[in-house]
């Protein structure tokens, strides 16, 4: 028998699964909401701007350090039979660490600095920086811009780095490494310092043949190239390859064998294509969760307005992966439910049904638009062909 462990880091919780590799059956699972949740309103009593969405990196290690031992103990499997561990993660969820991979927010004096914390994928505090990067790329007729939907999102890594450069240089001074949170977990597992082609390709303007676009970075800010070169750039491991074996320290901590192999991290929505078998040219998959990602594979790379990236080998080796989607789906359902009047909540409780079930009952006979209410609000930003995350209402 052989088994593998997959750890899925979503927006609100982490989920670890033990899988039988011979048949794909899930043997057991462990789910843990993040201890500190998503930090959006205030940080340690200090109010945050409305566009901030932060997390505490320690929560991610808790999922790993509690989940993996639980799976081994509850299932009774021999750790020697666990051949591999894989990580998927929301993206671009960006971490700033010291040379020992310690999150900057854990260092003395930085516990109240919001820019020292993990910038979650739906953090939109870097809109000004994204606009600057986009305009510079447009002015310089950057060829690659069309492969990112002819726009630059504040959700991506480079604008978030620029935000810290502009707003918190003291954080950058302490930072040795900037990486996707998924890369951080992989590096903690292996004791290495590598990057996945999936995260870099989709969120950092990195291309397999050309690397980072330092020529553009130089025109955006005279410090940006050096920051990316010194703190982001690292050996690349592609999807389908192996980073290496788990370190002795982490093997002992998690109860795994040192023979356990670790894969490069893959963006959470992208991993779904592997799970459902959507691995062929011209197949599209909608991955629905907190947001919804529309993903498609193709043998060729095209410039498509409105997408948020196209990267070779980021899901399946040799195929280009395309991504587009809506930034708020599950989040939007939750938002609507939370606006329910007390009478609705009381009725749902009395009938022992969820507020979602009650709301569905009340609107099931209505046609779309029948009420006359039109809403164009800001919900995690906008990833349509408009790419206008500042839209908040009708004009």
What annotation goes with each model-predicted range?
Residues 32-36, 91, 184, 300-301, ...:
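Short glycine-enriched loops at secondary-structure junctions
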Residues 43-61, 66-351:
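Glycine-rich phosphate-binding/catalytic subdomain of phosphoryl-transfer
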Residues 10-54, 109-113:
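Short glycine-rich, Thr/Ser-proximal phosphate-binding strand/loop in the N-terminal lobe
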Residues 392-393:
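Conserved small/polar residues in nucleotide/adenosyl-binding loops
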Residues 375:
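Active-site diphosphate/adenylate-binding microenvironment
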Residues 2-29, 86, 93-96, 287, ...:
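Gly/Thr-rich phosphate-binding beta-strand-loop-beta motif of the actin/hexokinase/Hsp70
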């Amino acid at each position: 028998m052989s088994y593998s462990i997959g750890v899925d880091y979503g927006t609100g919780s982490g989920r670890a699964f033990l899988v039988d590799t011979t048949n794909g059956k899930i043997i057991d699972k462990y789910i843990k909401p993040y201890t500190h949740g998503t930090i959006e309103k205030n940080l340690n009593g200090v109010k945050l701007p409305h566009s901030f969405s932060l997390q505490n990196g320690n929560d991610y290690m808790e999922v790993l350090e509690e989940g993996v031992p639980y799976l081994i103990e509850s299932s009774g499997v021999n750790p020697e039979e666990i051949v591999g561990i894989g990580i998927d993660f929301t993206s671009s969820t960006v971490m700033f660490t010291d040379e020992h991979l310690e999150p900057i927010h854990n260092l003395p004096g930085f516990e109240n600095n919001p820019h020292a914390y993990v910038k979650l994928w739906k953090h939109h505090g870097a809109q000004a920086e994204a606009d600057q990067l986009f305009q510079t790329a447009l002015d310089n007729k950057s060829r690659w811009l069309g492969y990112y939907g002819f726009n630059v999102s504040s959700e991506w890594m480079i604008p978030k780095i620029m935000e810290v450069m502009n707003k918190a240089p003291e954080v950058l001074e302490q930072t040795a490494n900037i990486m996707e949170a998924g890369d951080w977990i992989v590096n903690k597992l292996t004791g290495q310092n590598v990057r996945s082609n999936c995260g870099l390709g989709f969120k950092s303007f990195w291309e397999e043949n050309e690397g980072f676009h330092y020529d553009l970075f130089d025109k955006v800010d005279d410090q940006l190239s050096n920051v990316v070169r010194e703190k982001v750039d690292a050996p690349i491991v592609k999807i389908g390859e192996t980073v290496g074996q788990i370190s002795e320290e982490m093997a002992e901590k998690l109860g795994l064998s040192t023979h356990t192999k670790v894969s490069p991290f893959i963006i959470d929505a992208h991993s779904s294509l592997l799970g459902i078998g959507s691995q062929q040219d011209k197949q599209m998959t909608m991955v629905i969760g907190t947001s919804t990602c529309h993903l498609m594979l193709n043998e060729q790379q095209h410039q498509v307005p409105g997408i948020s990236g196209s990267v070779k080998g980021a899901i399946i080796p040799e195929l280009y992966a395309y991504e587009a989607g809506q930034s708020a789906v599950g989040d939007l359902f939750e938002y609507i439910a939370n606006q329910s009047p007390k009478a609705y909540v009381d009725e749902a409780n009395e009938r022992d049904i969820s507020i979602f079930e009650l709301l569905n009952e009340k609107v099931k006979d209505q046609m779309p638009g029948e009420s006359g209410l039109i809403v164009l609000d800001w919900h995690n930003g906008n990833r349509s062909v408009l790419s206008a995350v500042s839209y908040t209402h009708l004009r």
